[in-house]
Structure formats: C-alpha cells, structure tokens
A protein has these predicted regions:
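N-terminal leader/capping segments at the start of a protein or of a new domain
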Residues: 1-46
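Short hydrophobic/aromatic beta-strand or adjacent loop that forms the aromatic wall/cage
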Residues: 3, 76, 149-153
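Short, surface-exposed beta-strand-loop junctions and turns on beta-sheet-rich folds
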Residues: 13, 20-23, 96-98, 106, ...
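Conserved Nudix-box catalytic region and its N-terminal flanking loop in Nudix hydrolases
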Residues: 28-31, 82-120, 124
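Acidic, metal-coordinating catalytic segment for phosphate/diphosphate chemistry
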Residues: 34-78
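Active-site beta-strand termini and strand-to-loop segments that position acidic
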Residues: 81-84, 156-158
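Unchanged
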Residues: 104-193
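Charged phosphate-binding loop/patch that engages nucleotide di/tri-phosphates or the phosphate backbone
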Residues: 193-204
Length: 204
C-alpha cells in the first residue's frame, strides 16, 4: 500500500512515499525522526484550522509503523450492504449518515464481526459477504488517550425484505436504503471517511 489516509473527524493526515501533489494539502512534511513526527501529530490534533497534512517518506512501512506507535490501536469491522433492488444500507448516528460497524470482540473473526454489527445495528438477517473493501482509519480521544481505529470493510449482498430496526441503544436513530443516485446529495450529512468509501465503492 502506497498511501494511508487517517481521518481526524473531517480532517485528515495522508501518509505517503512521496509528496502527493495531486491533492490540495495545507502542509507537507518529510519524515526525518519520530520526535518531529509526534510533534506534528500533536499540533494537528490541537489546531483545528489545519484541514490536511501530507507526511511522506520513501520507506513508508517505517513511517506508518512509527505513526501507529503514537496511538493505542483498536479494530473494528463493518459492511456496505447492497440489496438486490440496487439500494445500499445506511444508518444515521449523531446526526450523521454512516455505515453499520463496531468493535471487534476478543477472539472474534473480522468477517463475523462485520456481519454481526450489520444485524445488530440495522435489524436484518441473511446478508452475506461478497468481498473485502479497503480499510479506513480514524482517530479519537477518550480519557486522555489517543486511539487509532482501523475499520475493515466488506461489501455484502442481501435479498431479504427491507424492513429495518435501528439499534437505539447505540445512538442509531434511522436505518435507510438509498439508491446510488441519491448519494451525491448527502455529502453535508456524512463523514469525509464515509464519502471516500462511497466514492471508491459505489460512485466511481
């Protein structure tokens, strides 16, 4: 993998082997040492006016390893479910459009977690995995600890009825099925990481 895009809510840091001039970033930084790298991350977390940074290094494997060490890593999995009608399954949580996903439990297989989370959050059964999609990364802080969450995504198929039940206990207020041509109008109500996934998997 030549790039890693890590989301900080609707901002992001791009990790790459060389400067990614195709994108419009506020800042470019070449990786030299971990001390400077961790200062860049800390400053980015606190300065919300910076929308994006590109950190690059020819040895991207080493850079990515050092970047991850800054955080406590957690794993999650979720699904992009396509109904035989052509609609895709979405949830609404905290006022934002999203996809069903959740933390991988201890000893749980990633694929089984993704299937379970779709069932629990949306109230459907009988869906199955078609293939994996590229993972997404985002950060969050809890009780003074910075976490890096890797979410493994899977394209799923479903041919059952479209009756759903949102998991209210998880803050999910709505579950809906949307056609691809409805997705361009939801950008203002979706996370940037979700739009990346939609653009890659549905709209391209």
């Amino acid at each position: 993998m030549n790039t890693y895009k890590v989301h900080f809510e609707n901002r992001f840091i791009m990790i790459s082997q060389e400067p990614d001039r195709l994108q419009k970033y506020g800042l470019f930084h070449k990786f030299y040492d971990t001390g400077e790298l961790y200062k860049i991350i800390t400053d980015f977390q606190s300065n919300k006016t910076i929308q994006a940074i590109n950190i690059y290094c020819p040895d991207i494997a080493h850079l990515w390893k050092m970047f991850r060490i800054y955080f406590t890593e957690v794993g999650a999995a979720g699904g992009l479910v396509k109904h035989t009608s052509g609609r895709y399954l979405f949830i609404e949580k905290k006022g934002k459009l999203d996809l069903p996903k959740g933390h991988i439990e201890k000893g749980e297989e990633t694929e089984k977690c993704a299937l379970r989370e779709v069932s629990e959050e949306c109230g459907i059964k009988g869906h199955s995995i078609v293939k994996p999609i590229y993972p997404s990364y985002h950060t969050y802080s809890w009780e003074g600890i910075s976490y890096l969450k890797k979410t493994s995504w899977f394209l799923m198929k479903y041919d059952g009825d479209m009756i759903t039940k949102p998991q209210l206990s998880e803050g999910i207020t709505k579950v809906e099925w949307l056609f691809p041509d409805e997705l361009n109008s939801i950008k203002s109500s979706a996370w940037l990481s979700l739009m990346d996934l939609i653009n890659f998997s549905i709209l391209r």
